[in-house]
Design a protein with these regions (language model features):
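Methionine residue identity
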Residues: 1-4, 17, 27
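Acidic, Ala/Val/Gly-enriched low-complexity intrinsically disordered segments
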Residues: 2-5, 9-12
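Bacterial N-terminal signal peptides that target proteins for export
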Residues: 12-23
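Bacterial N-terminal signal peptides
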Residues: 24-32
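Non-transmembrane domains of secretory- and envelope-associated proteins
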Residues: 37-42, 47-50, 68-70, 100, ...
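N-terminal mature ectodomain segment of secretory-pathway/periplasmic proteins
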Residues: 43-124, 172-176
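The alpha-helix within a helix-turn-helix
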Residues: 212
């Protein structure tokens, strides 16, 4: 009986040692993975926060932007314009290169009855004031002149960080450093796994644009999902429309390694490529004089 007890104790000790060794093995295996995961999360967070800080730190910028946006019929509409922009208070001068080459837009928040001054560059060659949502100003594009630049982009990211907390960075894949347009860029891909179409009950007098603005959604997407409704049409109380719960399903960014601006943005919905924006000739350091946001500035044709 003593022999059997000793044998049983010995077997238990061997099993305990085996479990202990297996535990050490798992720790050794998983610790580097956990450490690498943590380091990558820190890097992703650092890139995103530096990007937001850089955007918020530059009130005046000038740039040339190329856009390619999917239309309601599935074809892509391209355009290009040059702009001088002040983020706060919002002011922008833009000159079209395509389509509507030579057309100019001047919008100053709170001035001219909050309308944009437009030189359409065609007969009878007079400048007219329009609501910023007017279709002529969009040139068949997705966004109005008030959404140009990076401010909306910054607000979008901040809303997602507030909503998801640190879990937001789990959506992000760090793809490495790439040379793009002769600039070294961090490339990140954001997959919004919970993106979906939902029903929305409208408040009295809301418009599609206001719903998009208040919920950080893509107004063009709402327009396509509700083709019978104009952006500025006032909706009825409890009217049911279809919206998305997030701006995009997937977002690919090339973030300039030097200045941390997202100079190439590729946006996907549930169908595929929805829109992309390319920023070139980005100038972050010049001072734009007040007269440059005036119709009297030399070189403008208002």
């Amino acid at each position: 009986m003593v022999f059997m007890a000793n044998k049983s104790d010995s077997t238990a000790n061997i099993l305990f040692m085996n479990y202990k060794l297996f535990g050490y093995f798992l720790m050794a295996l998983l610790f580097p993975l956990s450490k690498n995961y943590s380091q990558e999360t820190i890097l992703k967070k650092e890139i995103v926060l530096k990007m937001l800080d850089s955007i918020d730190s530059h009130n005046q910028i000038s740039f040339e932007m190329f856009r390619s946006e999917r239309g309601e019929n599935g074809t892509y509409i391209n355009g290009k314009f040059f702009a001088k922009l002040q983020a706060s208070p919002y002011k922008i001068y833009a000159k079209m290169k395509s389509p509507k080459e030579g057309a100019e837009i001047l919008y100053l928040e709170g001035e001219n009855n909050n309308k944009a001054l437009v030189n359409p560059n065609f007969f009878p060659y007079i400048s007219i004031s329009f609501d910023p949502n007017f279709s002529l100003l969009k040139a068949d594009g997705h966004h109005n002149i008030k959404e140009a630049g990076f401010v909306l982009f910054s607000q979008l990211f901040k809303s997602h960080i507030k909503k998801y907390g640190d879990s937001f960075y789990d959506f992000i894949s760090y793809d490495g450093i790439f040379n793009w347009n002769e600039r070294k860029c961090y490339k990140i891909t954001i997959n919004y796994v919970d993106y979906k179409l939902i029903k929305y009950s409208c408040k009295e007098g809301e418009t599609l644009y206001e719903i998009a603005e208040n919920n950080y959604l893509n107004v063009a997407k709402l327009r396509f999902l509700n083709p019978e409704i104009n952006d500025s049409k006032k909706l009825q109380e409890s009217q049911q429309i279809t919206i998305t719960n997030l701006y995009s399903k997937k977002l690919i960014l090339y973030i300039d390694k030097q200045n941390y601006f997202p100079i190439y943005q590729i946006v996907f919905d549930e169908i595929g490529l929805f829109e992309k924006y390319i920023y070139t000739q980005l100038n972050l350091n010049s001072t734009i004089k007040a007269i440059e946001f005036s119709r009297e500035y030399k070189g403008y044709d208002f």
